[in-house]
Design a protein with these regions (language model features):
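Short, flexible loop segments at the rims of nucleotide/cofactor-binding pockets, characterized by
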Residues: 45-51, 99-103, 121
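Single conserved hydrophobic/aromatic residue that forms the stacking wall/gate
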Residues: 1-12
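Conserved coupling/interface region of RecA-like P-loop/ASCE motor cores
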Residues: 13-27, 204
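Hydrophobic residues at beta-strand termini and immediately following loops
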Residues: 9, 29, 100
Length: 204
């Protein structure tokens, strides 16, 4: 039984009011780049996910945040692995860093779930796909959208993940990292996708 989008939004909003789910703060972090005119969407994605300073910004943000932090990416080899390696090599010993993607079997995903439900300061680097369908984590405090995503449903599913209220949580924060690489009056592809996502956030 599929809820329509309008019903789904009503459910989220009503549940927040009743206190069944955590309240959600959304921070859009718009990174300003030198103007660039990309021929294709793929060219822009490659530029973004291979951008060293951008990836280090995500690493520093994740390491600075307190609480269980989920970092969502779109491409395993292209973005997920480099991010995981960057974060894991800089993390303090007592802070666990996990890497979850479509290739990780169900048992591993369950292990990650049980760890986060027992921990309060872990970092999980995960593919959108794994989390939008597979894992429910009650004890999430922060979510970072590290890769551009234009899928409305996927964004809503990701938001739903964070909103399940843990025993010690009433507030969660979403960090949506976006990129302004506009060339003259021409907005870059992923900036247009951000504008779409902001509409969703405002509707929520």
């Amino acid at each position: 039984h599929q809820l329509t989008r309008r019903q789904r939004q009503m459910c989220i909003r009503d549940s927040m009011k009743k206190g069944h789910v955590a309240t959600l703060d959304i921070n859009v972090l718009l990174l300003k780049h030198p103007p660039n005119k990309f021929e294709t969407f793929e060219d822009e994605i490659q530029y973004i996910i291979n951008h060293d300073r951008r990836n280090k910004f995500i690493r520093n943000l994740a390491l600075d945040l307190k609480g269980n932090t989920l970092i969502l990416f779109a491409r395993v080899e292209g973005h997920g692995e480099p991010l995981y390696n960057l974060i894991n090599s800089n993390s303090l010993e007592q802070r666990h860093v996990f890497f979850v993607h479509g290739g990780v079997d169900t048992e591993d995903r369950e292990k990650v779930r049980s760890i986060t439900e027992n921990e309060n300061n872990a970092i999980i680097v995960a593919s959108y796909g794994t989390f939008s369908t597979g894992i429910n984590i009650k004890n999430l405090h922060n979510v970072i959208f590290a890769s551009p995503s234009k899928s409305r449903i996927r964004n809503l599913q990701s938001i739903g993940r964070i909103l399940r209220k843990g025993s010690n949580k009433t507030k969660a924060t979403l960090y949506d990292i976006a990129d302004d690489i506009s060339f003259k009056s021409r907005k870059n592809y992923t900036l247009n996708h951000l504008i779409e996502r902001i509409k969703i956030y405002n509707e929520e």
